[in-house]
Amino acid sequence: VIYGQSQGQSHKGFFSEPNDKPTSGLIVIHEWWGLNEDIHLMNEQLAGLGYSSLAVDLYEGKSATKVKDAFQLSTNLSNNEQRALDNIKQAYDYLKNEVGVEKIGIIGWCLGGKWSLRGALMLPRDIDATVIYYGSLIEDKERLATLEMPIIGFVGTKDRLHKQFIQFDQDLKDLNKDASIHFYQG
């Protein structure tokens, strides 16, 4: 599905609808490999749970199977953060205005977890829930204070981001946010 456009380039993603009337919408953000078959399958599973799910393509048609290629794609993305944020905003607008869902959450894994949080920070009064699977975080408490939605995060205790998640959890507690960060052994 084409859900938006910026700088003359269409934003294309993978859209999945539930069999029944959707309960809510989800912006689904891929890990650093790109919008691949794994994300398509996850998007379908989320639709099976009742969500209108839009898996965005932050790499604009590219994907990787090798670490060096994924690293290059993620670096290029980080060098053009505004374009990525525009992409997420247009996904939100598509779900809200074209699909017609009232509540919209955002979920991402790894690189997608990073952008899930950034999308929530961009739309702190519009996003209704944020899910972060082991993505790099924002450590600025002033920015985190703007978040108004429930936040859930997941990270392994041996993950390189483990300590960052401990601080993130404490910051959210200090700010009295509705947040639940889960730490898994391994």
Where is each model-derived feature located?
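Short beta-strand/loop motif that positions the catalytic acidic residue
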Residues: 147, 153-155
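Short phosphate-binding/catalytic loops that engage adenosine nucleotides
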Residues: 50-51, 100-101, 176-177
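Glycine-rich His-Gly loop
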Residues: 29-32, 110, 156-157
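Serine-hydrolase catalytic machinery in alpha/beta-hydrolase-like enzymes
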Residues: 1-97
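Primarily recognizes the serine-hydrolase "nucleophile elbow" in alpha/beta-hydrolase
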Residues: 89-147
